[in-house]
């Protein structure tokens, strides 16, 4: 079976959006960021959604519905939220309808990237990382999620690599598998 999409999963700050956009550009495929789709759909930031009464549960429901809408199309690079894999049905849908690539990084690398992102003009707020000890929170969440991330088709350690290097690895691997 040829899988028709590439899904990029991984912890917050692993580079999913940046790398996904780069891979889509290189392959001339459509790039979709699920978090951005949710923001567009709800007219609320991810942080605002998390602050609603239903909080994370409500966000995960919207995330699942958005994924279900997207899997019916082809030639897409889909960047997911870091926690999408917490729902086993989401992971199964991605594995059945595409090739799942996990971007992995050490907790210190993730913290550095998230701090750099928070300094950008976007001022991205990561609700699940709202903590006095962010490194400890990253380690805890990563330890919980890593066994699920390991079910991906391919895992790339991104520490010390540029988005272009990671993108080239993804494309090289994709070509080997599907040529």
Feature map (PLM): residue ranges:
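NTP-dependent small-molecule kinase module
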Residues: 1-3, 22, 26, 143-179
């Amino acid at each position: 079976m040829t899988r028709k999409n590439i899904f990029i999963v991984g912890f917050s700050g692993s580079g999913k959006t940046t790398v996904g956009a780069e891979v889509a550009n290189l392959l001339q495929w459509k790039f979709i960021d699920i978090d951005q789709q949710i923001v567009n759909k709800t007219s609320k930031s991810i942080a605002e959604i998390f602050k609603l009464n239903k909080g994370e549960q409500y966000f995960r429901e919207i995330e699942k519905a958005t994924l279900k809408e997207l899997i019916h199309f082809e030639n897409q690079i889909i960047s997911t939220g870091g926690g999408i894999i917490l729902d086993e049905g989401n992971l199964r849908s991605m594995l059945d309808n595409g090739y799942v690539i996990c971007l992995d990084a050490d907790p210190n690398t993730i913290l550095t990237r998230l701090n750099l992102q928070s300094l950008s003009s976007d001022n991205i707020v990561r609700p699940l990382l709202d903590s006095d000890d962010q490194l400890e929170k990253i380690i805890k969440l990563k330890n919980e999620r890593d066994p699920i991330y390991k079910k991906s088709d391919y895992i790339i350690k991104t520490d010390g690599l540029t988005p272009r290097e990671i993108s080239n690895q993804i494309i090289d691997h994709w070509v080997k598998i599907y040529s």
